[in-house]
């Protein structure tokens, strides 16, 4: 497995382009199964989970075609099997997203219970209950969810999510797109990635309204047609590079992004002392060589502060002036990176779902020079004195396209070495 070697101390300065959002691309790829003709999806990030989803289609008999711009064409009419096997699903929880589209379009599906990232418990109950509300018969046996649509297909339903679930909202919304009648999803997830999926369904001729609010209304249609669609930019990648510049006292301009989907993060960066300017598809951050100020934050579902940016802000607070409290309300076990930061001299006290971080002037390379991988630790290594070796970077590669190349473009001293 590859490793990253980072020499801290460089002040980042430059411009980079933001990749497509993995968390929008995966449900959009799943939704191509709803169409009755070929669909082309562009701006896909080159990440392991995207490759796994495309491989899953291959196992089902669909042969994805990739063009010179790395857009992928999927023709669901060539599907030969309605089974998503365990050996692929276990590596990626998002595989569950093919369940709703397959039941809606083909009348049945068999999807292995997912594995993937080990953050807390993420039950698939909401997906199952939502499909049952639409008339599907579902059994869970032998590690597989086996679903069958009723005679005449899925029926529109009113469904209330008792906890906000992004993938649950997406799965039921996709199924409802081809169901008979109207579906109303209440307490739905409001994330921009849900909106992007709704826009994609509508681009194929669907009738989805209210995405981005907590009530989504879907009027089922008889068929969804071919479309050409470009995936939205990745807001977490955007935020991570902005924080990278902030912790080093530097300047960065991120292009091909969308400032409107990152307002909670930009607000906290301003609190930390950053000067921020935005355009339609770019954000510029400048710290003017200053050390950031510590910030308090609480994660919550969109449009509040995203849980996927929490660790990066702990890295920021760790070298900031003052003390900041970070409260995690979404996932359990989301402070696993803190132990590694302690080894770098960070002053962090964890009490339940809260991390109290008191900034120090400088972080140091840990005793043996090694850290377990996470994007937040890459940020910490950028400001540590000396060379830090980050191993097990599989998890970074799952979420970030070409992280070392983009950081090099900003002046970071970072290189990838074979494991």
From Swiss-Prot:
It catalyses: phosphoenolpyruvate + UDP-N-acetyl-alpha-D-glucosamine = UDP-N-acetyl-3-O-(1-carboxyvinyl)-alpha-D-glucosamine + phosphate. GO terms for molecular function: UDP-N-acetylglucosamine 1-carboxyvinyltransferase activity. UDP-N-acetyl-alpha-D-glucosamine binds at residues 93, 122-126, 308, 330. Pathway: Cell wall biogenesis; peptidoglycan biosynthesis. SUPFAM superfamilies: EPT/RTPC-like. Signal peptide: none annotated. Phosphoenolpyruvate binds at residues 22-23. One of its GO terms (biological process) is peptidoglycan biosynthetic process. InterPro entries: Enolpyruvate_Tfrase_dom, Enolpyruvate_Tfrase_sf, MurA_subfamily, RNA3'P_cycl/enolpyr_Trfase_a/b, UDP_GlcNAc_COvinyl_MurA. Its EC number is 2.5.1.7. GO terms for cellular component: cytoplasm. Cell wall formation. Adds enolpyruvyl to UDP-N-acetylglucosamine. This is UDP-N-acetylglucosamine 1-carboxyvinyltransferase.
């Amino acid at each position: 497995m590859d490793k990253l070697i980072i020499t801290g101390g460089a002040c980042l300065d430059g411009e980079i382009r933001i990749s497509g959002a993995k968390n929008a691309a995966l449900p959009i790829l799943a939704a191509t199964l709803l169409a009755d003709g070929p669909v082309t999806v562009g701006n896909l990030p080159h990440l392991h989970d995207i490759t796994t989803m495309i491989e899953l289609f291959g196992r089902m008999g669909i042969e994805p075609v990739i063009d010179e711009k790395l857009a992928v064409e999927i023709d669901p009419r060539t599907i030969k099997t309605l089974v998503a096997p365990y050996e692929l699903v276990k590596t990626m929880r998002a595989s569950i997203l093919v369940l709703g589209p397959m039941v809606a379009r083909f009348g049945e599906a068999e999807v292995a219970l997912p594995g993937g990232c080990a953050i807390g418990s993420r039950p698939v109950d909401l997906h199952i209950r939502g499909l049952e509300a639409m008339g599907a018969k579902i059994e869970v046996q032998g590690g597989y969810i086996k679903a069958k649509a009723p005679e005449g297909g899925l029926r529109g339903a009113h469904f209330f999510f008792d906890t906000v679930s992004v993938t649950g909202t997406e799965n039921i919304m996709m199924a409802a797109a081809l169901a008979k009648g109207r579906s109303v999803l209440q307490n739905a997830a409001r994330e921009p990635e849900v909106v992007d999926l709704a826009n994609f369904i509508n681009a194929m001729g669907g009738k989805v309204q209210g995405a981005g609010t907590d009530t989504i209304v879907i009027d089922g249609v008889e068929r969804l047609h071919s479309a050409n669609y470009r995936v939205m930019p990745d807001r977490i990648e955007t935020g991570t590079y902005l924080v990278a510049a902030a912790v080093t006292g530097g300047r960065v301009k991120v292009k091909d992004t969308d400032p409107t989907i990152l307002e909670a993060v930009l607000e906290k960066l301003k609190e930390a002392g950053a000067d921020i300017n935005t355009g339609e598809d770019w954000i510029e951050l400048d710290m003017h060589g200053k050390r950031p100020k510590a910030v308090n934050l609480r994660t919550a579902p969109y449009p509040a502060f995203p849980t996927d940016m929490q660790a990066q802000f702990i890295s920021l607070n760790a070298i900031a002036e003052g003390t900041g409290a970070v409260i995690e309300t979404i996932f359990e076990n989301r402070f696993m990176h803190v132990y590694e930061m302690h080894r770098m001299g960070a002053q962090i006290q964890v009490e339940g779902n809260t991390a109290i971080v008191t900034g120090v002037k400088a972080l140091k390379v840990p005793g043996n020079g090694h850290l377990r991988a996470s994007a937040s630790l890459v940020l910490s290594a950028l400001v540590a004195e000396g060379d830090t070796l980050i191993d097990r970077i599989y998890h970074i590669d799952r979420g970030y396209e070409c992280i070392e190349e983009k950081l090099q473009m900003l002046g970071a001293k970072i290189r990838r070495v074979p494991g």
